[in-house]
Each structure stands twice: as structure tokens, then as C-alpha cells.
Amino acid sequence: FNTVAYDKKGKVLNGLPVDFSFTGKSFDKSNSASGLILKDGRFVGDVAGKYIVSAKIGNITSSKAVNIFQRNVKREVTTVGTGLVNDKHTSDFWVFEGVDKKDYAVTGTWGADGTSYFWDVTNPSNIKKIDSVQVDARTVNDVKVSADGKICIISREGASNRKNGIIIIDVSNPYDVKIISEYTKNLTGGVHNLFIYENHVYALSNSERYYIINIEDPKNPYEVGMFEIGKEGQSIHDVWIEDGIAYSSNWRDGVYLVDVGNGIVGGSPEKPVAFGNYTYDSGANHAAFPFKSKSTGKFYAVMGDEIFPNGVNANGLNETAGFLHFVDFTDLNNPKEVARYELPGHGSHNYWIEDEILYVAMYSGGVRIVDISGDLLGDLYKQGREIGYILPSSPNGYIANATMVWGAQLYNCLLYTSDAADDLRG
């Protein structure tokens, strides 16, 4: 809402302080109206109803009535196919197009025996386990595949020889994958997450910093750069790269935007340069995903929490907490947190954004699909933006009949998920 003030002669008065407020009444008599209005007059209603928005300057008030209706974005969500892992926890995954133009996936495992599985998902209603690789590790937390579908990188934690590092795998034939090489320099403390971008691997080292490794020749990888925030007690959980910008999630130190080839501040893989940062009070920044809104032109970093209030039960159900923070980075020098997606009773984990739709793994809350088009403001869950959800589980899972969704990825118009309790799904 915009206000214009005039004097008695009809001249516009600029710069006067305006106080905005609202009242409302829900269309649903069993509910109460709620919403949010900012100092600049932007208003959002959480609940369908009739609202009155008022602007006050001194003792003069002007009001306008507005009706808020439901977005009506609901869709049916159904499972097409399942690839079951029932003897260990499934961790992260990646779906990719192979060199033969068919569709494949790779999944890691957590707290187990260092196994990664490869799947044919060309027919998503008949997901087939086609090969596996076992390495010296307890956990293969992260797996990624190069854009050309030829190289897979898996992370290692808990290796018996304490070297950990990454394993480089030839997946040109996903039915017969071959280990090409390993790389352990500066990564012996364990690699929790990694990312592949333009012939480089960005690998976390002991959850403190990330090293940048050239894999142009996958038989002879070599280090070219490193990034750390340079603070005492620094910690990093994840890194994601898009358009030459790395988004590192650093727990209490929030997200860092780092030029690793975009050119915005002259950065490169050999010389990464940070140019943006945002922190928030919980100190639980676990993941970050960039989002450029097509409908508004605004640029966001969507930052996710990971919180286990009672610790982690490795072999049972877990209570989770936390939510997604939508931070407007349109002005890189003045980022502002403007919205949240919080599912009551469940915490966030990994997520994917495409075409103004958010696909978020909420652990025991399943996978939630959320409309994030238009101006984002306030509590997106309360505003009825949820398109649909699914609560995957299996009576034959590693944890029977449990839901603990780890991640989500949209691929070829299908949503794929991994669940720590049992499987890969599409």
C-alpha cells in the first residue's frame, strides 16, 4: 500500500512518517485473521478473510478494505516408484542423465560400511539397483555427478586409515562403475559434503573449510584453491555452486557468497573471493540455495536450519526442528530476511528450487512442495502456499514404517527423494 499526503492547498508533502496497521476477520468462523504489514506498506494476510489496512500520519487516518482469498495451489502427489535399501541408512543422492541418454541415480549411505548404490531410473515405476561401490568409510554422506554424466564423486567419513577424502568414479557405464582415483590431501579429517562445478570439486575438510580440486584429468586430481571464513571456531556444513558463485553454509556464521568464477568481484577457483554474508540468531545454518524470482526479479538465498533438540538417535526416530529463512539479497550490501517456511513439529534438511517451486525434505515431515512465486513476505506455511506433500515409508525399510526424508531433487518433471529410513523414490 502506498500513501500520499497533501496540505490544505493540495500540495504533496514528502517525507512524513507513516504508521501502517491492519485488522481483519477470517471467512472461516473457526479461525482468526492474521498477517504482517511492514513499515513500507507491504501487507500479507495469512488467512483468507476481509482485512482493513490503515495508514496514519499524526491524527489523520486513511483506510482501505481488501479481501484475501486462498491461493488454491493444491495438487495430488503420488509415488511412482521405489528403490529399497533396507540394511542401512540412505544418505544423499543425485539423479543424472548418463552418456547413453538414459536416466540414473546414485545414493550414499550413513553410519554403515561405505557403500554407494547406483540405480537405473529410466523407468521410474521400476527403479533398479544396478551396481555398487564399497570404500573404506563408515559414511558416504554426499554424492555428486558431473554435468556430462561421466564422473561421480563420493565423500568419505570414518575411514579406518583416517585418510578419508574423496573417491572419483567412472560412471560412463552405470551398470559397471569403476573407481578411477582417490584424493585425500588436506581432507583427512573427513568430507561431509561436496559439489562439482566446471571440472572442479569443492570438498569440505573436517567441517572447517573447503578445498577446490581440479579433476580435468580424473586420474590426477590436484588442489588449486581453498576458502575459509577465517574465524576462531569456524565451521562449515555445505557448499553449493551456481553461476560461478559458491554458497557456503557456516552454522552460526550463516551463509557466505563467494565468487569462484562468476567475476562479480574477480574471483576464481584459484582465488575465491567472498562478497556477501548473512547470519541469523539460531546459528543453525545447514544449507543454502540461490533463488532468482521470475515473477518479481528479486534474488534470494534460501537458508535452512538443521536442529536435533534431543540429539541424534542413529537407529530410531528423531525429533527435528528449524525452518527455511528467505533472505532477500537483491541488494548484496544489505540482505534482509523477509519470509520463512516452517512446518510445525518438523525440521528442515535438504531442498531444491525450480520454476518458483520449493521442494523441501522435512525429515519426519516428509517432502513438502511449496509455491514461492510472487513477493515473499512473512510465514509461507500459514499463507497456504503448500502445493502438496508425501510421507514416504516402507514396512520393509531399515527403520520400518518410518519417515525421515533426507533430500529432494526435481529431474525430468519428477520429484526424487532419499529417505534415511529406507529408500530412493520418484
Predicted regions mapped to residue ranges:
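Short stretches within intrinsically disordered, low-complexity N-terminal or propeptide regions
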Residues: D7, I57, M303, D422-D423
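Extracytoplasmic soluble-region selector
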Residues: F1-N72
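Short linear sequence elements within intrinsically disordered, low-complexity coil regions
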Residues: K25-F27, S32, D176, H200, ...
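Feature marking well-ordered beta-strand scaffolds used for ligand recognition
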Residues: A48-K50, S63-S418
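Single conserved hydrophobic/aromatic residue that forms the stacking wall/gate
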Residues: Y416, A420-G426
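Intrinsic-disorder/low-complexity peptide segments enriched for small residues
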Residues: K11-N14, S34-L36, G378, R385, ...
